[in-house]
Amino acid sequence: MAGHSKWKNIQHRKGRQDAKKSKAFTKVAKEIIIAAKGGGDPVANSRLRAAIAAAKAVNLPKDKIETAIKKGTGELAGGDIFELVYEGYGPGGIAFLIEVATDNKNRTVAEVRHILTKSGGSMGEAGCVGWMFDKKGVLTFPKEAYSEDQLMEIGLEAGCDDVIDEGDSWAVHVDPSSFEDVKAAFEQAGVTAESVELASVPQNTIEVDAETGKKLLRLVDALEENDDVQNVFANFDLPDEVLAEMED
């Protein structure tokens, strides 16, 4: 039950950097609005509960959280946010899944298509790459705090799929249907995750050369800078020399 996903490691590093950007507030507020469409009580709505936790992690003010919930439930105007997934290709034929939350579908699809095309990629048809990814619950734990054996002991009993070596952290992968049970098992054991998310995990990754890797990272950055883009997933793996340059 081991492996190493450098791409996933980059995602987590970028996630920590994202918290410093003003976009983080917009991103978590939109997720709360969408989640609250399923009910405004976080006790009964696990997605809303996770969205509120993510909002608190980036210090979104309490009144902003409450406003976003009310927009989602329809108590306030401004809840017309649509959740969509675009599929396409980046440089080197790398598969991309792009999750967006938008109040204007036409604007967003045009912007995402432009970013992909400008980067040497292309927008694809629905279903063209989605089959290459599996939806997983992902719980990330710091290596300095927990061993792989600790996490496996708790996770396997609760129903986790795998424990992945992410470099400076462990990632526990869970089938979405078991996500709440596995999260609860770790919480009851006093084992605290750095992050908890539902992610589209590539079934296989493609290692790319340094030049292609840099192009792909620029594409990821351009997509993530778009206000409507919530998450970006891709199936490439970065060579060590590219990672070393990123550490400089």
From Swiss-Prot:
Cell inner membrane listed as a keyword: no
Q: Which family does it belong to?
A: Belongs to the TACO1 family.
GO cellular component terms, alphabetically, are: cytosol
| Residues covered by region (Disordered) | 1-22
Provide any one GO MF term from the record: DNA binding
- Domain of life here? Bacteria
A single GO BP term for this record reads: regulation of DNA-templated transcription
Q: Which organism is it from?
A: Oleidesulfovibrio alaskensis (strain ATCC BAA-1058 / DSM 17464 / G20) (Desulfovibrio alaskensis)
UniProt-listed NCBIfam families: PRK00110.1, PRK12378.1, YebC/PmpR family DNA-binding transcriptional regulator
S-S bridge residues: none
Q: Which UniProt keywords apply?
A: Cytoplasm, DNA-binding, Transcription, Transcription regulation
Q: What is its main location?
A: cytoplasm
Recite the lineage of the species.
Bacteria, Pseudomonadati, Thermodesulfobacteriota, Desulfovibrionia, Desulfovibrionales
**Know the name of this protein?**
Probable transcriptional regulatory protein Dde_2325
InterPro entries assigned to the protein according to its UniProt record, in alphabetical order = Integrase-like_N, TACO1_YebC-like_2nd/3rd_dom, TACO1_YebC_N, Transcrip_reg_TACO1-like, Transcrip_reg_TACO1-like_dom3, YebC-like
* Locations listed in the record: Cytoplasm
Basic residues bias (residue ranges): 1-15
Record-linked HAMAP family? Transcrip_reg_TACO1
